[in-house]
Amino acid sequence: MQFIDQAEIEVQAGKGGDGIVAFRREKYVPAGGPSGGNGGRGGSVILVAVEHLQTLLDFRYSRHFKAEDGKRGGPNNCTGANGSDRIIEVPRGTMIYDADTEEIIGDLVDNEQRLCIAQGGKGGLGNQHFLSNKNRAPEYALPGLEGEHRRIRLELKLLAEVGIIGLPNAGKSTLISALSSARPKIADYPFTTLIPNLGVVRKPTGDGTVFADIPGLIEGAHEGVGLGYDFLRHIERTRLLLHLVDLTAEDPIKDYQIIQQELEAYGRGLIDRPQIIGLNKLDAVDETVVTQIENDLSQITSDPIFKISAVARIGLDQMLQATWEQLDSNPSEVNISH
């Protein structure tokens, strides 16, 4: 399935039904009064967050959505039927912006959470409403009002508590595969992962925590280089970052610093997010080299460092234990209104 995390749509709420001009025409009532009914309300356009959608792919092909118009009023003071609302399903984690003003309209995080993005027009008043002492037989009614029209930008930000970050080929997909039942594509070359992968990792209590394998970031990612800016946004909702560093790389310390610089340049508090560092591919490097890298890294960061091998499953339990402790000690709410 193709991963689409941005889309722009156009929505049109329904027009209100027209009020009508009508008079009572009953036997034995020679001078019946006005009885024109009101028009029905136009349907609204409503977004609903659902769990079964993981991407905004559907909006690549369907971009125009219209709710039903209200029906015109009827005689005998009958109000016209309301137009049906147009319900649009989106994935949980979708942020909604006005495409013209960039104003944030809403953020749909919870399952079945709803948000009206275009209000249906009010129905027009029938001539029954214009009866007065001066005008006993009003010959006019009001038309229904137009429904709202808007251009909307949708932006999906993954709902994961832990984000796995690092340069391409650091072993992020291997790690999420080792920790969970997720089975991402894995190969020994950069940019194997072209979409974020989600996996549920079980705590000792049995509770599940969602981890996200964020596609490989590179220098200049905050400016859109590589897979860049589009995937940095998916880290925004996380509470904790697992930063993988490839021990077999030419300069692991520089690799670590590149990712830190990208987080800081992107802003929005990412550089302040708690981190746990995993020195990965322990099984492929001499122990003295690993010790030197660990010592050098500890000189520039106070974040906890673990020596692991995702493929050989070495050191993962200790790193996970630190992950659970970090999550338990930090607030569950992260500021995501950006």
Swiss-Prot record:
Q: What is its EC number?
A: 3.6.5.-
The UniProt entry's sequence similarity note says: Belongs to the TRAFAC class OBG-HflX-like GTPase superfamily. OBG GTPase family.
Intracellular or extracellular location(s): Cytoplasm
Q: Which HAMAP family match?
A: GTPase_Obg (MF_01454)
Which purpose does this protein serve, as stated in its record?
Answer: An essential GTPase which binds GTP, GDP and possibly (p)ppGpp with moderate affinity, with high nucleotide exchange rates and a fairly low GTP hydrolysis rate. Plays a role in control of the cell cycle, stress response, ribosome biogenesis and in those bacteria that undergo differentiation, in morphogenesis control.
Q: Which positions in this protein are listed as binding GTP?
A: 166-173, 191-195, 213-216, 280-283, 309-311
Q: Name one GO biological process term.
A: ribosome biogenesis
Taxonomy, top ranks, is:
Bacteria, Bacillati, Cyanobacteriota, Cyanophyceae, Oscillatoriophycideae
What cofactor requirement does the entry state? Mg(2+)
The superkingdom listed in its UniProt entry is Bacteria
Report quaternary structure and partners: Monomer.
Q: Quote the protein name from its UniProt record.
A: GTPase Obg
**Domain OBG-type G span(s) in chain numbering:** 160-328
Output one GO MF annotation. GTPase activity
Q: Which InterPro entries match?
A: G_OBG, GTP-bd, GTP-bd_Obg/CgtA, GTP1-OBG_CS, GTP1_OBG_dom, GTP1_OBG_dom_sf, OBG_GTPase, P-loop_NTPase
- Coiled coil feature spans: none
- Residues annotated as binding Mg(2+) are S173, T193
Instruction: Cite the Pfam families for this sequence.
Output: GTP1_OBG, MMR_HSR1
Q: Which residues form the Obg domain?
A: 1-159
* Enzyme class (EC, first level): hydrolase
Q: Name one GO cellular component term.
A: cytoplasm
Q: Which UniProt keywords apply?
A: Cytoplasm, GTP-binding, Hydrolase, Magnesium, Metal-binding, Nucleotide-binding
